[in-house]
């Protein structure tokens, strides 16, 4: 990644944050790829640009549901032109918000950790589901299944709605659940018209200086969501997804112990992953 004249205040698995002032920051999506909570050595070319374009598309499309982290400024308002030219497709000027301390996950279909919980208990995060559901079953209604935010390198833990209320308060939990489900429903309905099923997704929320709940970070990207193709979807199977699954599958078969450092991923696996991210962008925005 290029060096910027702003002060870097945080480096996450994918995004770097730079301080502009006490109210604004610059969020830059890198080409880093993480799998199994380990950052891989090989970046995915243009991934940061594609993720930013997908996120920006959704932020604008869903802006009528709730406020988001945009300030309305561009990178050219806060960086010298030469630096702005380098990051213009992968950076956004954002409000500095106080993050809500939970991961806000909405599921419309049964798979992943939700399927494991359901098989064991008939519930997900304490929510009772109908009997007889199988892998990739569509749920009667989308459900809000929060998890606790883990430190970098640890795994998030699914929590019940009651635990969510204890963590962030009854009123805020209600607001977060309602907004998360509204965002998911509208996005899922739109994506379906483009041949994409949004199986599940994770939203990030924060509070602004006036305590207003605000959508932040990234929205409905292949990094934060599971996207399936309508064409290959079949209940009872594990449908292929538009994301880093190629890389995860290759790593699973490589015999790697899932501890850093990760093995070098072959170029063709990296390329297939880029193609999948690009396909999502094209399908959603054209």
UniProtKB/Swiss-Prot annotation:
Keyword annotations of the record: ATP-binding, Ligase, Nucleotide-binding, Purine biosynthesis
Superkingdom assignment: Bacteria
Keyword Calcium: no
GO annotation, biological process: 'de novo' IMP biosynthetic process
EC numbers on record: 6.3.2.6
SUPFAM superfamilies xref list: SAICAR synthase-like (SSF56104)
Keyword Nucleotide-binding recorded: yes
Enzyme class: ligase
Reactions performed catalytically: 5-amino-1-(5-phospho-D-ribosyl)imidazole-4-carboxylate + L-aspartate + ATP = (2S)-2-[5-amino-1-(5-phospho-beta-D-ribosyl)imidazole-4-carboxamido]succinate + ADP + phosphate + 2 H(+)
This protein's GO CC annotations: cytoplasm
Any one GO molecular-function label of the UniProt entry: ATP binding
InterPro entries, per database record: SAICAR_synt/ADE2_N, SAICAR_synth, SAICAR_synthetase_CS
Pathway: Purine metabolism; IMP biosynthesis via de novo pathway; 5-amino-1-(5-phospho-D-ribosyl)imidazole-4-carboxamide from 5-amino-1-(5-phospho-D-ribosyl)imidazole-4-carboxylate: step 1/2
Family named by the database record: Belongs to the SAICAR synthetase family.
NCBIfam families: PRK13961.1 (NF010568), purC (TIGR00081)
Record's protein name: Phosphoribosylaminoimidazole-succinocarboxamide synthase
Organism, scientific name: Histophilus somni (strain 2336)
Species lineage: Bacteria, Pseudomonadati, Pseudomonadota, Gammaproteobacteria, Pasteurellales
């Amino acid at each position: 990644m290029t060096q910027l004249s702003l002060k870097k205040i945080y480096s996450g698995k994918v995004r770097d944050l730079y301080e502009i002032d006490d109210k604004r920051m610059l969020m830059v999506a890198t080409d880093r790829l993480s799998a199994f909570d380990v950052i891989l050595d090989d970046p995915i070319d243009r991934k940061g640009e594609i993720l930013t374009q997908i996120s920006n598309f959704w932020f604008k499309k869903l802006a009528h549901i709730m406020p988001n982290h945009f300030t309305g400024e561009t990178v050219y308002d806060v960086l010298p032109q030469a630096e702005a030219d380098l990051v213009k497709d992968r950076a956004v000027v954002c409000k500095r918000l106080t993050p809500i301390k939970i991961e806000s996950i909405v599921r419309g279909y049964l798979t992943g950790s939700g399927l494991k919980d359901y098989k064991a208990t008939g519930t997900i995060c304490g929510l009772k589901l109908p009997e007889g559901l199988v892998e990739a079953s569509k749920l009667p209604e989308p459900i809000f299944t929060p998890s606790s935010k883990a430190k970098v390198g640890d795994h998030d833990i699914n929590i019940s709605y009651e635990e969510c209320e204890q963590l962030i308060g009854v009123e805020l939990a209600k607001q977060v659940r309602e907004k998360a489900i509204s965002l998911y429903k509208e996005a899922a309905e739109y994506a379906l018209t483009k041949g994409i099923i949004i199986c599940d997704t994770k939203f990030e929320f924060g509070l602004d200086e006036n305590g207003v709940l605000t959508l932040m970070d990234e929205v409905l990207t292949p990094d934060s969501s599971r996207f399936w193709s309508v064409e290959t979807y079949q209940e009872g199977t594990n449908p292929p997804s538009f994301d880093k699954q190629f890389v995860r599958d290759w790593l699973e078969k490589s015999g790697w112990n899932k501890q850093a450092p990760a093995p070098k991923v072959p170029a063709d696996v990296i390329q297939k992953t880029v193609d999948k991210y690009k396909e999502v962008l094209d399908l959603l925005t054209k």
